[in-house]
């Protein structure tokens, strides 16, 4: 709707709105003072009404999603992972269904299309290429978006992202982090555990936001479960804790000498060694 309104303004050489939100209170007041033909003004008003209607429908959908998330322990457990919010957690949980269908994390990775493709001819060596991109593409895209968010949050996941980015670039690092998230998600859902490096105050804040979106009453002036997140010293303490975990992970893997799988020698190679 905003783009349609912008196109009408642009067709009449009206400059861009000085307000950040064209459909906000300030933007609408600015629109009211613009000189437009009567039919174009009616079109702008029609687009604004449609924008408001869609906004109300989205609020209802968001409320229903929040209520569904609050009643699902698996979704709340996934939200302990940095970068995973309500939408990502619900999408992943819906795509996975019953996690017992996957007896190993590698099977979940393959189901989401995050495993590398393998090409092999006869007894020759196997060549690993790009990810297969098979399976649930929507969930895979959600995990990649969560990986980008996790890369901006201190913790072992960011250390992993930075390590891969230094060797392969940021896009490969994002996909590798998404695969790492899929493995973590399998373990959390299979074992009924929360993320080991979760920030309790931040998770409590996420859950409180869920309650407000679900229509729970706002209790102003009272210390709720998310009160600790409002204390800066507490937030800083949790941040230092995960930064220490990130530094420990970086030190741990600094001495690794990654090697690929051993390749079986072909007959010609064995004859040459004799």
Per-region residue spans from a language model:
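A detector of single, family-specific signature residues
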Residues: 1-274
């Amino acid at each position: 709707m905003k783009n349609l309104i912008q196109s009408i303004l642009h067709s009449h050489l009206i400059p861009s709105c000085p307000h950040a939100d064209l459909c906000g209170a300030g933007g609408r007041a600015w629109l009211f003072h613009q000189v437009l033909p009567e039919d174009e003004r009616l079109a702008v008003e029609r687009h604004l009404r449609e924008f408001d209607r869609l906004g109300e429908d989205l609020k209802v959908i968001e409320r229903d999603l929040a209520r569904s998330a609050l009643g699902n322990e698996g979704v709340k457990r996934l939200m302990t992972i940095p970068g995973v919010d309500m939408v990502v957690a619900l999408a992943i949980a819906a795509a996975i269904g019953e996690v017992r269908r996957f007896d190993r994390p590698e099977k979940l990775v393959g189901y989401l299309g995050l495993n590398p493709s393998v090409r092999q001819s006869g007894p020759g060596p196997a060549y690993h290429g790009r990810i297969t991109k098979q399976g649930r593409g929507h969930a895979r895209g959600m995990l990649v978006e969560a990986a980008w968010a996790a890369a901006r949050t201190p913790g072992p996941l960011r250390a992993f992202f930075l390590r891969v980015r230094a060797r392969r670039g940021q896009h490969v690092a994002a996909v590798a982090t998404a695969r790492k998230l899929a493995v973590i998600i399998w373990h959390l859902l299979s074992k009924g555990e929360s993320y080991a490096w979760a920030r309790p105050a931040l998770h409590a804040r996420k859950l409180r936001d869920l309650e407000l979106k679900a229509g729970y009453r706002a209790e102003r002036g009272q210390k709720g479960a998310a009160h600790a997140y409002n204390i800066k010293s507490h937030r800083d303490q949790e941040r230092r804790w995960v930064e220490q975990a990130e530094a420990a992970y970086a030190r741990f893997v600094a001495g690794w000498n990654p090697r690929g799988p051993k390749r079986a020698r072909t007959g010609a190679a064995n004859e040459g060694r004799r």
